[in-house]
């Protein structure tokens, strides 16, 4: 498996952009899917996108947001690239109690990545030994890398 992680600083985002173009959760989805599609296309592979359920209305809105990405693309990726890379034009949403392996892994690694990114980027001392070890493993072999081997902006994306 490979990992793409996005963290958004909502306070900084609100300061910088008075009017939000997206719901922050949907903005993160767009960035995640962009990176995933770019990576899949660079490896000549196809894949699927799944999210953990947040509830009826939220799930519907997230699925609609994904459908718009698939049909309209983004500022950086044409819709055809989404079609080549993704096996489905619909976001799969599953409840936590289904214990989907990929969603469980995402839950396990999200916090260590967040702590490492905020510790590094915001210069806080909020890291822990276990989380740092998890992050090091991810950095060595799991985070998606760009064409020049860079993780920042590819496997890790910090959004203001």
Residue ranges and their predicted role:
Residues 1-160:
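Phosphate-ester processing/binding pockets and catalytic centers
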């Amino acid at each position: 498996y490979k990992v793409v992680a996005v963290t958004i600083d909502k306070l900084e985002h609100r300061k910088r952009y008075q009017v939000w173009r997206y719901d922050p959760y949907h903005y993160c989805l767009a960035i995640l899917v962009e990176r995933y599609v770019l990576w899949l296309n660079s490896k000549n592979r196809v894949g699927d996108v799944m999210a953990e359920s947040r509830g009826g209305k939220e799930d519907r809105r997230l699925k609609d947001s994904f459908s718009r990405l698939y049909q309209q693309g983004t500022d950086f990726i044409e819709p055809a690239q989404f079609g080549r890379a993704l096996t489905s034009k619909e976001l799969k949403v599953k409840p936590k109690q289904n214990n989907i392996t990929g969603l469980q892994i995402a839950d396990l690694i999200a916090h260590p990545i967040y702590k490492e990114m905020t510790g590094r980027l915001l210069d806080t001392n909020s890291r822990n030994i276990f989380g740092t070890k998890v992050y090091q493993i991810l950095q060595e072999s799991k985070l998606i890398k760009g064409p020049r081997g860079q993780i920042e902006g590819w496997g890790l994306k910090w959004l203001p």
